[in-house]
Amino acid sequence: MTATRAPRAARGRVPLDQRGFDFSRPDDIVCGVDEAGRGPLAGPVVAAAVILDPAQPIEGLDDSKALSAKKRDALYDLIVARSRAYCVASASVDEIDTLNILHATMLAMKRAVEGLSLMPTLAQIDGNRCPTLMVRAEAIVSGDALVPSISAASILAKVTRDRMLVELHARHPVYGFDVHAGYGTAKHLAALREHGPCEAHRRSFAPVRAALDLIR
């Protein structure tokens, strides 16, 4: 595993013994990997892995958070249609509560890479940590804004998770999952206090535990 350094403003914590290495090779099959949903109080964490096709470039790829919902949806369709391979995977709320959110995120990323129909030789991961994989892995801080395949993965993960939360909203409309995607907005926290958590809430997260205490 290695970590590539982004420009100074984008740097995060990277272990000293992982800086300055570059394991890429000219003949590598590279997949980009990113996640969506580490911070929310409800719903799964979703990860995606994407191997882009250089013969079918996709214009406009960027960090999913920097794009409008309409632009993300349009790029989602292009990524699915033009990529050499892609896979979207997740870790459940139960897995998040059992493992903790970091390890559940690594699990979702591992599932996404291992679910690709084409085996990569190098996985480039957004952030400063890599899951344990059967292929070489490189962590890239702010990779979702720097590496097109990671940008593509961030879009697939974000769009997929947002759609999951819209479906969850249909079952539990009192929380407003279709608006905040499970994040701890003021309205979401107020609904938690009033109604208590549903089965999709992460009980290992402090605001959810606090809401549980109120109804006991």
From Swiss-Prot:
Natural source organism: Burkholderia vietnamiensis (strain G4 / LMG 22486)
Residue positions binding a divalent metal cation: 34-35, 126
A GO CC term assigned to this protein in UniProt: cytoplasm
Molecular function (Gene Ontology), one example: RNA binding
Cofactor note: Manganese or magnesium. Binds 1 divalent metal ion per monomer in the absence of substrate. May bind a second metal ion after substrate binding.
Name of the protein this chain belongs to: Ribonuclease HII
InterPro entries: RNase_HII, RNase_HII/HIII, RNase_HII/HIII_dom, RNaseH-like_sf, RNaseH_sf
Positions of the RNase H type-2 domain: 28-216
Pfam families to which the protein is assigned, alphabetical: RNase_HII
Family stated for the protein in its record: Belongs to the RNase HII family.
Record-annotated disulphide pairs: none
Alphabetized UniProt keyword annotations: Cytoplasm, Endonuclease, Hydrolase, Manganese, Metal-binding, Nuclease
UniProt-listed Enzyme Commission number(s): 3.1.26.4
Names of required cofactors: Mn(2+); Mg(2+)
Cellular localization per UniProt: Cytoplasm
Catalytic activity: Endonucleolytic cleavage to 5'-phosphomonoester
PROSITE patterns: RNASE_H_2
Matching PANTHER family: RIBONUCLEASE H2 SUBUNIT A, RIBONUCLEASE HII
Entry's Gene Ontology BP terms: DNA replication, removal of RNA primer; mismatch repair
Principal subcellular localisation of the protein: cytoplasm
Function: Endonuclease that specifically degrades the RNA of RNA-DNA hybrids.
